[in-house]
Amino acid sequence: ERYRSQIERGLGRSVAALLESGIDDAMGIPWEEAFRRHLIREVTDGALRSDIVALGQWWNEDSSVEIDAVGLAGRSSTPVLLGEAKWGRVENAASLLRSLQNKARALPTVADDPIYVVCARERLTDVPRSVQTLTAADVFDV
């Protein structure tokens, strides 16, 4: 409704461009949620560790560190899965892995050999062997 009168006056093309440019700004939170839901499906389908009992995002006490997905295992609720989802079309997996490893230092504890999962909208480059990758095609099973 906000731009309706401008569209009716013939400015539809420029209004569409304006709205399209703002979509990326709004997609971060829904994308991260879709990423977490996909990881939960992978746990329940047996594609990831079956001992994961909780999976969600994590923030440290002062909210300076956020991890998009942390999977906790066993009675001790030890973090065994760490994930980062970026809405960018192409992301560097090695860079995302380094960022996740740095963020993991803020966790009270973490498994000795956690699963690292990184996600981008279309493609990941420079993928280390120690990281699992996902794209929108995986998340939405396209």
Regions found by a protein language model. Name each.
Residues 1-142:
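A cross-kingdom feature that marks ATP-driven nucleic-acid transaction machinery
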